[in-house]
Curated annotation (Swiss-Prot):
Residues 1-23 form the signal peptide. The lineage of its organism: Bacteria, Pseudomonadati, Pseudomonadota, Gammaproteobacteria, Enterobacterales. It holds the Pfam family DUF2541. The gene is yaaI. Keywords: Signal. Belongs to the UPF0412 family. This is UPF0412 protein YaaI.
Amino acid sequence: MKSVFTISASLAISLMLCCTAQANDHKLLGVIAMPRNETNALALKLPVCRIVKRIQLSADHGDLQLSGASVYFKAARSASQSLNIPSEIKEGQTTDWININSDNDNKRCVSKITFSGHTVNSSDMATLKIIGDD
């Protein structure tokens, strides 16, 4: 009887762990240090081409101002998409999910995400954290 209870408990715990892992497919794609002067040369290159359906942006250290973002797909014609992003993110703030329009069956993978922007209200460089969801 004890072994039946142990097996049942083990299966229940395994199911809980399995479902928790599947429920959260959010992955930290990278962190970019934002300079104090406006620049459009900020790029996050993904070492492994990854299917990403949407992203979130977070200001981990300092406030930042963004003037643009684009996502580049691994494709024969170097397809890209401009993203609609908020112009300002305060320290500790995270944006809503920003959808990335991939192809119809969502099989196109992201190779690079570029940003234009800079740190505001700080002498230190702000950090922009990029979180992806597949």
